[in-house]
């Protein structure tokens, strides 16, 4: 009953945001990077922050440093959705937020090099999540799979976080998917959505890794990771500026060049990640071997796909 009430309140919050976005002209116009052709409301992913806030307010202010960090990174991402901000300012907010999250994790009691590694990995994951947010349904659908897996792991395998946090975030993702996981999306996540949900998932996976002392749980983000890293490598090989907009991700080739419906592409990414997670959980014992094999297999699929279909992108 509690989660049903939260779900209803989050729906109302999203509707309220739509009114504000419409009135203030917070919209997403098609450009050279986008895979959509219609002007659409931007920033609907702010509901992810509201979901985390609902948990924080109803659970005795649990994880205060994480919540402060999420507030900072959500704020600067929302400002960036409304008006472009300088890279330096964004970095200040992002690094401050990550420092607060590291403090919540208790990371500062570990050797200094672990903090450096964590900073690099966390920055990469947040950027990857942001880059991958390019078609209807992919951010919400992929996040739904990862959060559902985390809820299952937390309940069946090893408790690593308060379950209510994951359940509340699942409610927020369901609300967002209602408006975004469709042929003509009512809203896009925006930077505020992709960055905030990435930050929440990053916090949860970090808690799991610290609790189990097993980094191989990063397999929960294997599909996004392989697509993002190999696309960066591919663009470097093409001597492109990786800071400029593009449409060279595998999912973008599927949606734009092959004309596969956005929903189908998003479902493929969801299904592949779900299969990867299921395999990891069903066949324990050699977690790092499984992680390595998964990365190799996904990389081969990526390379073969690009060899076959990237020419369609070049022809445009």
Where are these regions (language model features)?
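C-terminal membrane-associated helical module and adjoining short loops/tails
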Residues: 1, 210-316
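"…together with the soluble PPM/PP2C metallo-phosphatase catalytic core" -> "…together
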Residues: 1-229
